[in-house]
């Protein structure tokens, strides 16, 4: 009987481990949703690694390195012309939200959707990380508008 119990427990752990949801981002455009899976972002041909300084109140600045896709390049992949919009909202799984102007997003080498920090894939909030995706605004001098756990982009 004990042997059957252990087999049952192992089976449950195996099945729940296999059902883990893969990271993705929903892009809402004019009332229509498009889902971008993690693999599309992780393997994007325009993904780059860049230095950044993480600043947090009460802590010393930390030099780090992120890897991600510049938003303008990601939108090109989706055949989206964002110049027709005024602003773009970014929502996180923890309820946080920021809104950026299209002009700021169009600034070269400024706004990135990142998936790696210091060579390691960003972990989800559930696993204690800032991912699976984090929006980095390189010209934000105090990193106050960076948003972790990004799961939705809304073009407005």
Task: Label the model's feature ranges.
Residues 18-156:
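N-terminal intrinsically disordered, low-complexity segments enriched in P/E/S/T
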Residues 1-16:
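Sec-dependent bacterial lipoprotein signal peptides
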């Amino acid at each position: 009987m004990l042997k059957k119990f252990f087999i049952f427990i192992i089976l449950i752990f195996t099945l729940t481990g296999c059902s883990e949801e893969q990271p993705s981002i929903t892009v809402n455009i004019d009332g229509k949703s498009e889902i971008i899976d993690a693999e599309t972002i992780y393997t994007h041909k325009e993904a780059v690694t860049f230095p950044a300084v993480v600043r947090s109140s009460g802590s010393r600045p930390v030099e780090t390195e992120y890897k991600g896709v510049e938003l303008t390049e990601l939108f090109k992949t989706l055949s989206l012309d964002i110049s027709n919009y005024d602003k773009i909202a970014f929502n996180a799984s923890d309820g946080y939200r920021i809104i950026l102007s299209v002009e700021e997003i169009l600034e070269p080498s400024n706004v990135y959707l990142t998936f790696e920090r210091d060579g390691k894939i960003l972990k989800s909030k559930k696993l204690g990380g800032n991912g699976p995706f984090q929006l980095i605004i390189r010209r934000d001098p105090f990193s106050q508008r960076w948003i972790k756990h990004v799961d939705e982009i809304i073009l407005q």
